[in-house]
Amino acid sequence: MNEQASSATLTEADYVAASKAQSTRKEYGKDLHYFLDADSSNCIPASVDQIATYLAKMAGHLAVKTIERRLISLHVAHLEAGEPSPVHHQRIKAMLRGIRRTKGIATKQATAIVKDDLLEMLVVAGKGKPMQVARNSALLIVGWVGAFRRSELATLRCEDIAWLDSGIEITLRHSKVDQSGAGFVKFLPNAHGSRCPRLALQHWQTVSGITEGYLFRPINRHDQIGEQPLTPHAVSQIVKRIIELTGRDPAKYSGHSLRAGFVTEGVLAGIPSYQLMQVTAHRSEQTLQKYVRIGKRRRIPSLL
């Protein structure tokens, strides 16, 4: 089938689906399956009664943020099916308000990996088989200095890197905040010695022989490199394994810890929000406020 014919077969639902990041679509799909599996009578379109029953069931064992996300997924499923959404019914809204008051809305955030944490991780990551050492070191440094999301690290390609004397520029072809694929360029400046992102990437490419395609790939127990890219989950697992080797609780960390650590460290260093946003690609300063609060809290001097 040629490209023109293929395009002609796309439906409105296809374009709606394409408007969302791949990871977001996957989460929506999983959430929809949870709803359908909760009761054999559940379907799309759903009734207000079905949503209310499901909401009450979720309230017994899920966090508020998870409940909210699943309701959003159900709302999107109705929109994509061209059906009115029962999620915005006053009865559902009232139930959700009650759940928030009862359970609270405190969010569980991944612990930030600040500079000292990162340097300690690089020491323990430097012990092991050559390929894993090179990949993991580059992954940690680039992920932290570039404040990358785990999904962005997983899909980085060699072709996205521009080598400069002063550092490297990495173009994100697709990301959570750039779903249109217009691209966002991050500049990662040079640093001293083994903590330099440019040198770490050059070393990884030299020992791995990876000069095109996906940059970060799986490595088996024989230190052999795979062809496919790492998954976002694999990025988190690498971070967790290395943080555990430093004696910390891996359950408190995730792939997001690198990004959170860069922003927290930047706030502690007094870097203005607009400059941090040039790295993080946050769309508003409001999103950075939780890191700003952490930074200000940690600046409080001891009175003893």
Name what the model sees in each region:
Residues 1-304:
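Extended, non-catalytic subsegments within catalytic or DNA/protein-binding/adaptor domains
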